[in-house]
């Protein structure tokens, strides 16, 4: 859900026609964005997708915990991937806007305790994040019992913020070092 309408959400009819056309080749659907939980009618769309027989993964930033709880309680999701933008103590820095951290924590706790598959992930943006930011997020998640934390590496392509096009991607060596260090945090 992400384009075509003024509110940024796709026309449900188009989505359903497309899925029905290709359903013999498709087993699962990822609902992504923007932020799909702000789209009106999301639950209705997911219910229809479920009736087609497809599994559903939701990508979310966690800003709408009540919507997330409703979708989970209705059995409309099979997997949730939530972006953790950075350490919660300075979350607005990583989002570019102030965010109610309680919503983020509420969504995080809902996902951890909901009984379906999940992962948390942070996109590392050089110059915005430090390595210590990632270690802080990893330690926070480990203490909550999370086992599935992924780091994504920022790529300067199709960015909403033009200045981000000038950011140099993380070197392979740095990425491997960070992945190894984060992995050690999750070792028991």
Question: Language-model segments: which ranges?
Answer:
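Electropositive phosphate-/nucleotide-binding environments in soluble metabolic enzymes
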Residues: 9-12, 131, 172
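Conserved AdoMet/S-adenosylmethionine-binding subsite of the radical SAM
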Residues: 16-28, 37-164
């Amino acid at each position: 859900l992400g384009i075509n309408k003024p509110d940024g959400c796709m026309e449900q009819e188009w989505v359903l026609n497309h899925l029905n056309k290709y359903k013999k080749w498709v087993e699962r659907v990822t609902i992504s964005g923007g932020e799909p939980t702000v789209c009106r009618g999301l639950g209705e769309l997911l219910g229809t997708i479920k009736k087609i027989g497809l599994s559903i993964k939701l990508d979310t930033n966690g800003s709408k915990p009540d919507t997330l709880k409703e979708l989970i309680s209705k059995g409309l999701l099979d997997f949730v991937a939530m972006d953790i933008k950075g350490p919660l103590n300075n979350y607005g820095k990583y989002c570019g806007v102030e965010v109610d951290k309680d919503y983020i924590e509420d969504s995080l706790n809902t996902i951890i305790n909901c009984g379906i598959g999940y992962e948390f992930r942070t996109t590392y943006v050089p110059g915005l994040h430090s390595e210590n930011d990632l270690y802080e997020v990893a330690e926070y998640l480990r203490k909550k019992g999370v086992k599935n934390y992924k780091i994504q590496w920022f790529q300067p392509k199709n960015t909403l913020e033009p200045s981000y096009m000038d950011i140099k991607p993380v070197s392979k060596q740095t990425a491997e070092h960070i992945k190894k260090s984060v992995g050690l945090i999750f070792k028991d």
